[in-house]
Amino acid sequence: MKNSDNKKVITMFKHNNTSATIMSVADSFDMRRGGKLNELDMAYETWGKLNQNKSNVVVVFTGLSPSSHIASSEKDKTPGWWDSMVGSNKAIDTGKYFVICINTLGSCFGSTSPVSINKKTSMPYRVSFPALTIEDMANASHLLIKKLGINKIKVLVGPSMGGMQALAYSVLHNKSVENIILISTATQALPFAIAVRSLQREVIRKDPLWKTGFYSYEEPPLNGVRIARKLGMTSYRSSVEWIQRFGRKKTTGAIINQNLFGIDNTNFEYEIESYLEHQAVKFQNIFDANCYLYLSRAMDWFDLAEHGDSTINALSKTNIKKALVLGVKTDTLFPIQQQKEIFEGLSQAETQVTFKTLNSLQGHDSFLVDTEIFSTEVKDFFDSL
């Protein structure tokens, strides 16, 4: 490892989450599958004002790839990843609620992760980072929330992997959550999702620059991360959308050597190829490979049924008053049947549940790109509280 790595790893991702506050929440943190962290830092951002009795708290857990910058703020005017959902007079109204978005444990945007410095070794954790689970994420978030002096969450919001964390949080810390919004998520990973993520991890590990996780931060395995992102994109969106959006359109100006299968090509032949490349290159430059591996595997491992012998029994441990469960028909990564199962389980737990199947062509990413239909449902839910 190069001598510059120690200093570089501390700052390399900060430019992607400059508005986050990083708080030390524990001197040590035991992980569910063994091992411990020698210090636990959590990154978060807030919007709105906390009322006097602290009864207006909304907490948002993110999916795998976003930072805590969910919306623009006075500190950072850059639009957030859910800017159309969160803000004054928006579905999650920062004029009424104190909104906290937490960067997930294991992510490279401020919270303790494989890129963090292990104080005992003065080196980045890298793959010496203990095995990470969704439950670890939930427990770390709970420590942060307690550190902020908050005992009760008015509404807990979780899309995708964030929904898994929200479910775990509601079971493990069941006196802390009043209401919940779960979007395009599940109580466990299905074979298709596990297969896709296993391939993503494999291409990262097969990148020669990965070096069994001890790569130089000056020469990270960008190619592996780039291809992994492309694989992910094929599961995040729907084939129906891509037929309408791209069809068989070809790019302009591409010089194609057919016998080299793209080795010397100056561009991609089809627009869909160019689109995937554009999205993947953006991602490879902002996300750490080891963090991706840990977060991806945590999703595969998650099974809420482990907390009650069955999903129904696990959900019966929650104390949620009202819940909103949303999904879309075109989601292949978290099929709509999985949201229906959450609805049925929470209903048996005597939670007042609203379940909606929304029509969107954008697949799993619908909640990020087709936000108008989601915003309507989320706003109606908040208005009902």
Model-derived features: positions:
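Conserved acidic catalytic loop of the alpha/beta-hydrolase fold
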Residues: S122-P124, S128, E135-V155
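N-terminal cap/lid subdomain of alpha/beta-hydrolase-fold enzymes
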Residues: E45, K49-N118
